[in-house]
């Protein structure tokens, strides 16, 4: 959804660093949501992960693949940059590597504290979960993703804006809880469930 909402028009290059389970889940999603687009996928080389990743998706003709040796090579000229690196205590980029119009999606929120405040807009899926970010008070323009979806705030306004969308995956929890509520409705044969603050663990 972040790509659909914040990527520039006619984007055609997606860069991915960190090629584990999360990256595979993203590729599966892109295979469905971008099925009418031809996309060049750039992968950061690490051990044999990039080659294995290509083999996994090479039958999908909408994707072409390019393996990059450095972070700079990966990011330069990419329209969308996705980081699924699970842990790092180092910065992963320089601001000058991001082209005009680039969208950066740091899935695990790490590695871009040296550049995020230089982007034109920074979107957060939940402020309280991300208020620890080192530059949270320095962003030029920032709001929650929801505010854009509900048209209470501006999204991308032109194809030159560099944008970051920090997502920590709260929607996954929302979907789980909604599913549990539906299950309760079926089990209890009721149309309404009283929602109140939980005092014990209902679902394990």
Predicted regions and their residues:
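A short helix-to-beta-strand connector/capping loop
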Residues: 37-39, 60-66, 159-160
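A general structural motif
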Residues: 10-11, 36-40, 101, 119, ...
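Adenosine-phosphate binding glycine-rich loop
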Residues: 3, 115-204
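Beta-strand segments within the central parallel beta-sheet cores of soluble alpha/beta enzyme folds
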Residues: 14-17, 40-43, 192-196
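Rossmann-like adenosine-cofactor binding region
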Residues: 63-137
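A short acidic, amphipathic alpha-helical/loop segment
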Residues: 29, 93-97, 177
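Glycine-rich adenosine-cofactor-binding loop
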Residues: 3, 7-31, 44-49
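NAD(P)-binding Rossmann-fold cofactor-contacting core
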Residues: 32-58
């Amino acid at each position: 959804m972040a790509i659909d909402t914040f990527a520039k028009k006619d984007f055609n290059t997606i860069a991915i660093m960190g090629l584990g389970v999360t990256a595979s889940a993203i590729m599966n999603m892109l295979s469905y949501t971008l099925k009418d687009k031809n996309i060049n996928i750039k992968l950061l080389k690490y051990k044999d992960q990039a080659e294995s990743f290509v083999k996994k998706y090479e039958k999908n003709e909408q994707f072409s693949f390019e393996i990059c040796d450095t972070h700079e090579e990966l990011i330069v000229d990419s329209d969308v940059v996705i980081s699924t690196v699970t842990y790092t205590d180092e910065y992963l980029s320089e601001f000058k590597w991001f082209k005009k119009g680039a969208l950066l999606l740091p899935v695990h929120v790490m590695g871009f504290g040296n550049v995020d405040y230089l982007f034109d807009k920074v979107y957060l899926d939940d402020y309280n979960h991300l208020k620890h970010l080192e530059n949270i008070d320095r962003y030029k323009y920032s709001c929650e993703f929801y505010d854009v979806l509900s048209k209470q705030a501006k999204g991308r306004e032109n194809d030159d804006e560099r944008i970051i969308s920090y997502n920590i995956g709260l929607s996954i929890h929302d979907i789980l809880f909604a599913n549990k509520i539906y299950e309760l409705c079926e089990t209890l044969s009721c149309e309404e469930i009283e929602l109140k603050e939980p005092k014990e663990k209902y679902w394990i």
